[in-house]
Amino acid sequence: MANDPRNFPQRKLLVTCALPYANGSIHLGHMLEHIQADIWVRYQRLRGNIVNFICADDAHGTPIMLKAQQMGMSPEEMIAAVSIEHQKDFAGFDISFDNYHSTHSDENRELASHIYLQLKKNGFISSRTISQLFDPEKEMFLPDRFVKGTCPKCKSEDQYGDNCDACGETYSPTELINPKSAVSGATPVMKDSEHFFFDLPQFESMLKEWTRSGSLQTETANKMQEWFESGLQQWDISRDAPYFGFEIPGEKDKFFYVWLDAPIGYMGSFKNLCDKRDDLDFDEYWNKDSKTELYHFIGKDIVYFHSLFWPAMLDGSGFRKPNNVFVHGYVTVNGAKMSKSKGTFVKASTYLEHLDPECLRYYYAAKLNSRIDDLDLNLEDFTQRVNADVVNKIVNLASRNAGFIAKRFEGKLAENFVEPELYNEFVAAADRIAELYEAREFGRAIRELTALADKANQYVDEKAPWVVAKQEGKDQELQEICSVGINLFRVLMTYLKPVMPALAARTEAFLNEELTWEGVAQPLTAHEITAFKALFNRIDPKNIEAMIEASKEDAAAEMAAKEKAEASNAAQETELSKDPIAEEIEFDDFAKVDLRIAKIVSCESVPKADKLLKFQLDIGGEMRQVFSGIKAAYNPEDLVGKYTVVVANLKPRKMKFGMSEGMILAAGPGGKDLWILEPHEGAQPGMRVM
């Protein structure tokens, strides 16, 4: 075998998946990336390489802060619960992480601060006052993802404030056309704030050289070239309080933008792993001159951050850059975007309740390649392909031979292997399949494997052991035929081991032999296997239907819970909580205010004044002219003849439209929501309000 790992030096790899955001459940879209990365990692381990496979929850940002408030818990409590759920889902799909951590950790805080201070020391951080979108209703600066509007470049509507899903462009939220707050729906206003910036343009030549290295996917390199031609911009790395994240060292009420500390979470998770193990050295993997290999698996929606900002941050702070960033497309279901109403937005946990995770691992592998293509999970094709390939072609190869070995030969394979040429053809395929695994061309590797399975089954069909078993004096021939079939199955399962580790483990128990890449070089002879048990079950379409229905129920329950939480929060948000009581005053201060009952004698709109009404008030033998900003709440004619309360001893104020000689009392937040105070029947003009 030319690709025998014993012929190559052992590689040391650090592999990561993009960090799932800690405000929701893992779904089948997430699983594409994690399955893709896990297959590659398992292949590398199978070849004898040292792999550290890490991930973490991305646990910072305004969305997490707001959702925690909605759920009535602290952000720390929420992200802890989400982390448990995420790790359970990944374990259910046999994702073989060496460590799973959180960006809200001591390791990440220390590393984020260190990298920032190094960048600042090296002249890559600057600050300036910017005009930023501010929600006037919620009284908070709006993070990028909480502003929506029309993309300034391609004009696609309903796009987030940091980047466009349609064209991939990144921009400032202030550049959006017709922006709206995603928190309240209000039109944001501009407000000044000091922000801190990472000087990305200083790294343009380095990034261009990195792009020309030839290792990046063609689509990624082409996209980066577009960004270079458009001109790199300084990157805003700060956010204002209130914000859930890490405070910027030396600054008050200023926090790191989530996209600064999120990729540093790769380092934080690895640092956490190093602290648990004596055989790992953090610096060996992250020093600028590291000889180890670093790979990131990500989705196409976050290429900009990983191919520009991240390598520039690392380079500017004295750390190594990734060897490569492997980008994949999105998952669609039945040719369309995943839909909660149709039940095709399937959570990982819902899938695991109804179907074998190995089925999805196989199907994704069968359709994955090294390009940035979207992958369609066609549920009918999913059923047919898994049943046809895994059950009918591969597992059936074992079942149709194992019975004869167990019953007629006490589980022992033949001493002589009678089909060396056929077996060598299977062994020779190892080099080609290895190249395809290494290149992440999993679909092509699966096609090579199933083509071999067809040849193996053709051999069994031609030799017909069920016929030979009925012929006297043919025991040795029967044993030899079935032993060939079992050995070909062993080779196939070795090649399939990175894709279907649970099936491979059951196969190893059946064969009484570990499946190793170098082990396929020689067939098993005179070897005892165990009694055959069903290794894999067919997909029942009814289980898929049940999964879809359960997903619809999940979506409905999620919506109901959200509405309940919103209603609860609305009920808790009292007028007093929205507008707290002012600072205490002494009684003598209050006694200075002279409140009197007044009768509205006349009321009219003030020309060229949007908010004002002009009143003539009788306060008990004396007439007063008063202007009041309640025009949006009342028609002037409706107020004539009513009684109200007025501050009678307020110093007259000269206004553009005349002198105002008092103040009418009204309650409410403003605008249309204002109500003048009216006394009970019996109160007369001039009476003092006690």
Curated annotation (Swiss-Prot):
Disulfide bonds: none annotated. Zn(2+) binds at C151, C154, C164, C167. The keyword Cell membrane does not apply. Its main location: cytoplasm. ATP binds at K340. Its cofactor is Zn(2+). One of its GO terms (molecular function) is ATP binding. A motif ('KMSKS' region) lies at residues 337-341. Keywords: Aminoacyl-tRNA synthetase, ATP-binding, Cytoplasm, Ligase, Metal-binding, Nucleotide-binding, Protein biosynthesis, RNA-binding, tRNA-binding, Zinc. Belongs to the class-I aminoacyl-tRNA synthetase family. MetG type 1 subfamily. HAMAP family: Met_tRNA_synth_type1 (MF_00098). Homodimer. Is required not only for elongation of protein synthesis but also for the initiation of all mRNA translation through initiator tRNA(fMet) aminoacylation. This is Methionine--tRNA ligase. It comes from Vibrio vulnificus (strain CMCP6). The gene is metG.
